[in-house]
C-alpha cells in the first residue's frame, strides 16, 4: 500500500511539472502567460460576446462593440487563460443531454426534491405543440447548462392527471429555484409569463430570478452595516461592480453553495462617495472580495482565478468543502492508487487483472467502512470547535500560491481527460518496466503463462480451503478429520481462505532434527572388499532377499511418483545433502521402510532416532541414501528425510508429507515402534 501511495504522489508531481512545462512552451511560442491580462479593446466583437456568454451577461440590447467591451470590463478583468477556455468551450460541438420525465414521481424526485440547483423544464400539454421549438430549445439547453442549470421535458400525455392537478393546461416553461437561503430548503416553481419566446429573453428571466436570491447593497450605510455584522456565515464573497444585476455564474454559485457561503452583490452604479470602500481596502472596480474570519482575500490575483463558473466553483470548494466533496476526492485517490497494482504486479495477464479486481474491491470496501465512523464522529455536538479549526486550516492552506497552482492544474487536466489518462498510462508503464527490471536483477521468478498461473491459483485455493490453519505445537491430537467427519463438513461450510490466507511456517523449527549415525564405520578399502566378497558369496543365498527388497523399493517409488501436485525429486547438483556428511557412507543393501539388518558393524544407530519415527535409510525427495553424519528431520507422520530437502519442500508451500500426504503441521498418533533385530536376516 505504501509503495502504491508513493507512486501516486510521484504521479501528481509529474503532472505538476508537466503543467509548468506546458506553460513554458506557451510562453516561449507566444510570449504570454495564462495569468496575463487581456485588453478587451484588442478583441473582436465575436470574442467579446463569447466572454459575456461564459460569464452570463446579456448583450441583446447592445449593438455596438464599444458597449459590449464596456460590459466585459464592468464584469471583471479578463485573463488569457479565461479567454482560451471560453473559446475552446464555444468551439466544442458536444450535445448536452436533457431529461425526459416519465411521470409525477420522476419529476418530483429530480426537480422538487433537488434542493441545491436550478431546473428549467418545458411542459408540453396534451395535443399541443411545445412552447419553444426544437432548434431554440437545443440552444437554450446549451446556454444554461454551462451555469449548472439542468433541463428537462415533461409531456403531459405520460401523466395527464398530474398536469391537471398542477394547472398545466397549456404548454409552458417551469423553473425551480430553492426558496430559502438555508441548505436543503424548500423549492418553488415559477412559470414563464413572457410574451417573447426567444432564447435571450428566457435567459434573462432565469438570471433575474436567480439574482433575486442574492443579497444586494445599494448604499454606503447598508454596506457598513453588512460589513460589520457577524452572523452564521463564516465565509462571504462580495462583488463590487457597476452592473444592474450580478452575472449568471455568480447567481448560480450562490444557489450551489447555499448554507455554506453567502453571496453579496454591491451595486456601486450611483455612488458618489466611495471613501468607505477605500477604508475597507477596496480600490478597484469590479472586485471579487472573499471575507473570512482570517481576513480579506482578493479573488483574481493568483493563477487560475478566472471570472468563470468552473474557476470560482473550484476555489470555493477548496475553502468550504462538503463532506460529499471529501468523500469523492478520497474515492478518486483510492481508486487511482488501486489501479497501480495493474502495473506493479508481474506475471500473467490474468494474474494482473485478478489482483487488480481484488485490490479495487478491498480498497473501496475499506474506504466505505472507514467513512462510516467518520460521519458519525462529525455529527457529535461537542466537535464544533474541531470542525471550525479544520475549516480554518483549509482556508489558510488553500489561499496560498501553491494551492492556486494546484487548482489551475486540476481545471486544466479535467478539461483534457485524454492527456490525464495518457500520462497515467505512461507512468504505469514506466513502473512496470522498472519493477520487471528489478525482479530480473534479483532473480525472482515471474510466471508469464496464464494457464500455469490459473493452475497454481486453483491449487492454492484448494490447498487453503481444505487444510486447517493451526500451529504444529498447539493443535490437539484428537481433532482428526478421519475420526470426526462433522469437522470436515464444517470446514467446507466455513473455509479459512479469506480469513487466513497463509499457513505460518513457524512449526518447521519445532520438527525433530538429528544426525544419522552408524554403529560401526569401516574405511573405503575395507568397505569395497567387504562389499565385493559379500556380493560374490551371497548371490545364491540372498537372491530372495534382494528381489523382495527390489519389489518394496519399486512400490515405494510408485507411491511417491503418483502423489499429485508435487515434484518427487531434486537435481543432484542442487541437492546439498551429500555436503552435510562428516565421514564415509554407510552402505545399505536393503532400502525399504521398516527394520533392516546386515553386519552388526554396518547397523545404523536406531537408538538416536526420536520415538515415533519410521526407520529408513533413504530420502524419497532426492532419492539418495542417508550417509553417516547427515542431518535428518522427521515429520509428524513418522517419515524421515534429509533436513535440507524437507525444509525446501515445506518452504515451497507444500505443507504435507511427500510420502503419505499427512499435513506437516498436524500431530498424528505414533506408530508402534519396530526395533531391528540382528538375527532376522538368514545367514
From Swiss-Prot:
One Pfam family from the UniProt entry?
zf-RING_2
Q: Where is this region: Disordered?
A: 525-548
Topology relative to the lipid bilayer, per the entry, is: Multi-pass membrane protein
**Which keywords has UniProt assigned to this entry?**
Endoplasmic reticulum, Membrane, Metal-binding, Transferase, Transmembrane, Transmembrane helix, Ubl conjugation pathway, Zinc, Zinc-finger
Task: Indicate where this protein resides in the cell.
Answer: Endoplasmic reticulum membrane
* Class of the enzyme per the UniProt entry, highest EC level: transferase
Which EC number(s) does UniProt give?
2.3.2.27
Q: Does the keyword Translocase apply?
A: no
User: What is one process in the GO biological process aspect for this record?
Assistant: protein ubiquitination
Tissue specificity annotation: Highly expressed in the normal cerebellum but not in the cerebral cortex.
Q: Name one GO molecular function term.
A: ubiquitin-protein transferase activity
Instruction: Give the RING-type zinc finger regions.
Output: 619-661
Q: What is its main location?
A: endoplasmic reticulum
Q: Which CDD domains match?
A: RING-H2_RNF103
Oligomeric state and interaction partners are given as:
Interacts with DERL1 and VCP.
- Its recorded name reads E3 ubiquitin-protein ligase RNF103
